[in-house]
Amino acid sequence: ELSFENGIYSEEKTSARMKLKAKAPAPAKKELLLPQDAQERLNRFLLEISMEWLKNKKHLIQRDCYDNGTEYIDKEKMQYWFEQLEYPLYHFDFEGFPCPLPRFKGESPYGQSVFEFSLHIEREPGICDKEKDNFIFLNKEYFDDERKELAKAIIDNFEYNEDGTLKGTMLGQSITYEKGRLEELANLYPEYSAKLLAIRDKSADLLHLLDNNKKMYEGMKHADIFNYYHKDLSGGYSIKKTLPLFVPSLTYKGMDVGNGMQAYIAYINYDSDQPTFNKLKTKAERREALKRYC
């Protein structure tokens, strides 16, 4: 919920009487971030739970990883996930604004109004040209409807087979978000529909590499539990938790825009003369921060 004060949107809650009564789509899953002292208290509480009380396989693995500082890795299931990929890989991500009131034709209250996407193409394992294979689209203006231009940029940067299917695999984290936005754009622009849906139909979710997908791993040993666990995950698999485990040098901490909410607040304050997050003072600075984040 946002309030508008002194020409700038903020994260403060609006008054109850200003809330819309329209039925809103299911919100995206939010990560629970605990203060350091609360996390430490939780850790102490975990140690007080007797192993004899734990019957669930997931809980036993989590406790073992916590007690012994080890990692749980199901190599068989993870290998199977990789075998489903077809190159090139399109690392794809959207940013959207859940606007309370529809901004443009075809949108709904609290629907995701997309304003940015990033695409990084991995031609073969580890092969990605820094200039040619990296593309970011970011709306130039807040009040202009640039969705058609965005949709055209998407289909122009993916490759297709002669039969119209996607050449390769679209890759993302919690891919249902990206697939939903592609479907919405396909409904808006029938001339782009076939290619947008072709992208949707050949996708792989990084979440299923580390967490689980019972349907995908049906018939395999341990099909009902996660594929990877580390004590620092604390039960969650958001990219903000998993990325630092594998590439410690990459982190969202300290970024001018470091999460989805900050991203759309920077976007809707494009032309504000008030500082955003006490750092971003100009539109150019906000745009650059959004590009780095996405």
Locate each region found by the language model.
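Short regulatory "switch" loops immediately downstream of catalytic or recognition motifs
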Residues: 123-126, 160, 211-218, 270-277
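Conserved RNase H-like, two-metal-ion catalytic cores of nucleic-acid enzymes
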Residues: 76-164
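Secondary-structure capping and boundary motifs in well-ordered enzyme cores
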Residues: 83-84, 88, 109-111, 146, ...
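Conserved DEDDh/DEDDy metal-dependent 3′-5′ exonuclease domain
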Residues: 133-264
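N-terminal accessory regions of nucleic-acid-interacting proteins
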Residues: 2-88
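Short amphipathic alpha-helical surface micro-motifs
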Residues: 71-75, 97-102, 187-191, 222
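Residues that form generic nucleotide/phosphate-binding pockets
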Residues: 48, 64-66, 81, 153, ...
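Acidic, Mg2+-coordinating catalytic module of metal-dependent nucleases/exonucleases
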Residues: 1-23, 36, 230, 234, ...
